[in-house]
Amino acid sequence: MKFRKTLSTTATLLLIFVTATDSSFAATKAVPKQIKVVAARPNLVTNLSAAAGDQISAILTTSTAVAYVGTMESSTVAPYTAQQIGGSDGFIAVIDATGAPIWDLRLGTTQDDIATAVARDRVGNFWVVGVSAKPAAITQTQTATDPQVINVDGVSVDPVTTPNSNLSQMVVWKVDVSGAIQATYVYDTYGVIMPTAITYSTTKFIITGLVGSTISQQGFKVELDSLGHFSKFVSNKVVAPPTGQVTSIKAGANTIKYFSGVKTIAGIKSWKPKVLTPVVVSYSRSGAVAAAYSLPGKVLSVSWQAGVGLVALSEIGNSYGISIIDGLA
């Protein structure tokens, strides 16, 4: 009898242990997190000076701010403060991680100028590359042709005029972190030039782009050292950027993938847009979806920087939008 009681007690304790273990397991069992696509809202929407030719050409992200460069063709409007210099001006503007303006600067001369790309050196200076219009050499006085002298049929025509400038002077502006120009470096070329990228490599900058005419263009590459000395032009093969491909960005422990236009996302069953929509998705190291955001407008560029997050530049109607999404790493 005593043996039976001990056996019964042992069985009861075993049952309690198993029940407690099962209960604990049920309480701690991981439940898959339901990820939804969140619509990103631009931190900054701007139409620059509101002129038809205004544009943002490039964007650069630091650990605390976002810089963007481009062209303005009219007088300054809020939130910008720098005054107009010439017909069209290059410019650089810097905003913080919330989209609030820090400073802006117009670049150029009284001629036409544009800014097309930007990089930073080790100190933190911004190096903005662009183009300035160089006045054409005048060999004789140019006058409008009188239509009545050569128009024997009496048809009304406009007087013929000769253009007095062209965008053939490549310019690099060195701007410090407070928005002051430190130096300007100029390189004359034989034709219309369009630098499309500038990158910093150890002790020098590498500038690439197109040069030639509207009929015939070729790629070029030129180097620039920290003292403003340009190397000789080197022919460079022009490679068209791929379209419709997925862009992967390493972001801390995670990986961000940018899809230029999708209707379905693996792992997010609730995502069912009616039209193709640009989306960024953050994946954990294990490959699980951690977060997802849809982006507004026509996306021009996407980048990520620790301290700021993901930064997307978009065309939204007649304006530009900069969306800053923190917490994707």
PLM features: residue spans?
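C-terminal segment of classical bacterial N-terminal signal peptides
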Residues: 16-25
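A sequence-level/structural motif corresponding to short, flexible coil/turn segments enriched
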Residues: 25-329
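Bacterial N-terminal signal peptides that target proteins for export
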Residues: 1-11
